[in-house]
């Protein structure tokens, strides 16, 4: 029997990959699944989904289908099944409370909610109340069962226009999250630009420790490796000791791997001991990896170092938040020269900018260059007149002041999303009249010696981009000067007493805004830190007006699943509401002396 699936770049690639190559490995169970089985599983699941929803190929086209499935083969099959139906996949985070999941289901107007066996009770809780229209509830049976006789798969073009894709929800700070609609064309373009820049290959084994309701986990670590024929090994949620054990496993004897040999047998055991060549994560994960290495056994430390050396870990990527220099430098030292590659992206556009594969193109503090097919520009806004000007290449330095010009990153190209779901006003607000997406992120462009020469590809040429922060949260206007919170954070994090840091702008009677730091002290170094000692430590590192004028020490900094800090909420929780901050500002002016001629 022949199975027919709609043609797409993803399905065409999967069909053409070596059938015996491993597509997915589930680390916990040791189960592995080959590329030859994947489309068969998708075809069977598609038949079930259409039958359970009472739809056909044409009537399901463009419908939103939510799913609550754990990381692993079943997730991959479910996502591809929805794409095969020409529908829009809406991945749900199992960690979210029921009210948040109900909001996403309501907002997306989901036709159906698919659940794995693991999350049936969670799905039933979500469906029990509070929904405008209750979606059909269904399970796709047997997605993990591999048929002994694999049927021939053929692809055909869509009978109607492609309307499928994925809907991811942005994390709202002042409003409820918005549904970002990414068409299959967007997803394909996003995956292809990464494939060209980062050179995914069938020989790659990618360790997947990320949540799958964010762009990082779905496009960078799932769809792109599938397009390339790489192997994806799921190991979520992240556990630092488990990850070090997995990385070290290929370089240890069986008896040295605590309990690992008991979980697997035969060929499957071998799959969980294939060296990891590709690991993409967020800065908090890299920080925890560095800290945990010292606590490993001597044998595990030695094997771990071999595992993450440039000879074995081909590519280590950091993103979704700024990478502190101490983490970057610490990883280079631990690995014997493996430089973390930084990149920049967001839900609406996938990845947009990236450093290159060549070490000279992995520039400290930079997110590199526009990826293949991505157009990027910087738009400068005059604070007084609100007049906007494009910062042309070669004009990065202001001719009058001699300072670097800063502007908003704006993007255009096939990777950019089609719009916010059922929200034309918000969509129109985020695009310029000439069709560029306004990211809200502020950056400078700078030519860096020995980099941007095209060694990593023709796309990685010229001046590199350096993110200064979010326009709304990370650009602090104090006494007529603009301060990048990210720049100040990098310098504070270079101090040995500091473990974590967030720099924010607070209302100030004297300066409009003042720079403030919220710090977690290092448990290794110990001791304390006062505002005066912080300012003294920074006065030789950054200009006086950038040095924090306020300081709070906290036990921890709250972060979301991707390691990001909501600075608006942080200011409220640490410093209080605006009027309280203003009173604090007045009080501090009367109590605090000016240090060494700097503003207090």
UniProtKB/Swiss-Prot annotation:
Disulfide-linked positions: none
EC number: 6.2.1.-
Ranges for region SBD2: 343-420
Keywords for the protein's UniProt record, in alphabetical order: ATP-binding, Ligase, Nucleotide-binding
Gene Ontology molecular functions: ATP binding; medium-chain fatty acid-CoA ligase activity
SBD1: annotated span: 241-342
CDD domains found in the cross-reference section: MCS
Cited SUPFAM superfamilies: Acetyl-CoA synthetase-like (SSF56801)
The protein's name: CoA ligase FVEG_12633
């Amino acid at each position: 029997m022949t199975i027919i699936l709609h043609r797409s770049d993803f399905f065409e690639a999967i069909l053409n990959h070596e059938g015996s190559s491993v597509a997915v490995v589930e680390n916990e169970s040791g189960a592995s699944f080959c590329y030859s089985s994947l489309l068969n599983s998708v075809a069977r699941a598609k038949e079930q989904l259409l039958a359970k929803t009472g739809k056909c190929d044409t009537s399901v086209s463009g419908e939103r289908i939510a799913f609550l499935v754990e990381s692993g083969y079943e997730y991959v099959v479910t996502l591809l099944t929805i794409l095969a139906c020409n529908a829009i996949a809406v991945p749900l985070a199992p960690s979210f409370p029921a009210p948040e999941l109900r909001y996403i289901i309501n907002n997306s107007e989901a036709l159906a909610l698919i659940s794995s066996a693991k999350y049936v009770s969670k799905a039933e809780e979500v469906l029990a109340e509070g929904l405008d229209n209750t979606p059909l509830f269904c399970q796709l049976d047997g997605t993990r069962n591999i048929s002994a006789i694999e049927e021939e798969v053929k692809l055909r073009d869509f009978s109607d226009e492609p309307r499928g894709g994925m809907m991811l929800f942005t994390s709202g700070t002042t409003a409820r999250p918005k549904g970002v609609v990414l068409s299959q064309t967007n997803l394909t373009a996003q995956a292809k630009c990464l494939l060209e820049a980062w050179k995914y290959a069938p020989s790659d084994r990618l360790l997947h420790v990320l949540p799958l309701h964010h762009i990082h986990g779905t496009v960078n670590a799932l769809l792109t490796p599938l397009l390339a024929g790489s192997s994806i090994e799921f190991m979520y949620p992240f556990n630092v000791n488990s990850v070090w054990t997995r990385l070290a496993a290929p370089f240890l004897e069986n008896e040295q791997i605590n309990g690992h040999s008991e979980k697997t047998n035969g060929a499957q055991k071998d799959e969980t001991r294939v060296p990891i060549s590709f690991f993409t994560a967020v800065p908090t994960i890299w920080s925890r990896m560095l800290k945990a290495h010292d606590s490993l056994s001597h044998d595990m430390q030695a094997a771990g170092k071999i595992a993450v050396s440039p000879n074995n870990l081909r590519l280590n990527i950091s993103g979704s938040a700024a990478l502190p220099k101490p983490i970057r430098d610490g990883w280079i030292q631990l690995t014997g020269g493996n430089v973390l590659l930084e990149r920049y992206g967001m839900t609406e556009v996938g990845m947009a900018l990236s450093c290159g594969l060549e070490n000279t193109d992995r520039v400290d503090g930079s997110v590199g260059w526009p990826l293949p097919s991505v157009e990027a520009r910087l738009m400068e806004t005059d604070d007084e007149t609100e007049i906007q000007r494009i910062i042309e290449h070669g004009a990065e330095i202001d001719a009058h002041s001699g300072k670097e010009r800063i502007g908003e990153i704006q993007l255009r190209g096939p990777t950019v999303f089609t719009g916010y779901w059922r929200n034309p006003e918000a969509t129109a607000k985020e695009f310029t009249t000439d069709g560029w997406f306004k990211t809200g992120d502020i950056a400078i462009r700078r030519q860096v010696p020995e980099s941007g020469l095209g060694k990593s590809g023709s796309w990685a040429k010229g001046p590199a981009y350096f993110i200064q922060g979010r326009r709304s949260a990370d650009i602090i206007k104090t006494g007529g000067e603009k301060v990048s919170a990210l720049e100040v954070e990098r310098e504070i994090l270079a101090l040995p007493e500091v473990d974590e840091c967030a720099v924010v702008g607070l209302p100030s009677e004297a300066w409009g805004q003042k720079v403030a730091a919220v710090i977690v002290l290092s448990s290794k170094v110990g001791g304390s830190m006062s505002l005066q000692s912080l300012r003294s430590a920074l006065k030789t590192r950054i200009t006086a007006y950038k040095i924090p004028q306020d300081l709070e020490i906290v036990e921890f900094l709250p972060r979301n699943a991707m390691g990001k800090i909501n600075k608006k909420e942080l200011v409220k929780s640490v410093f209080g509401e605006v009027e309280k901050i203003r009173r604090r500002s007045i009080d501090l002016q009367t109590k605090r002396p000016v240090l060494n001629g700097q503003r207090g």
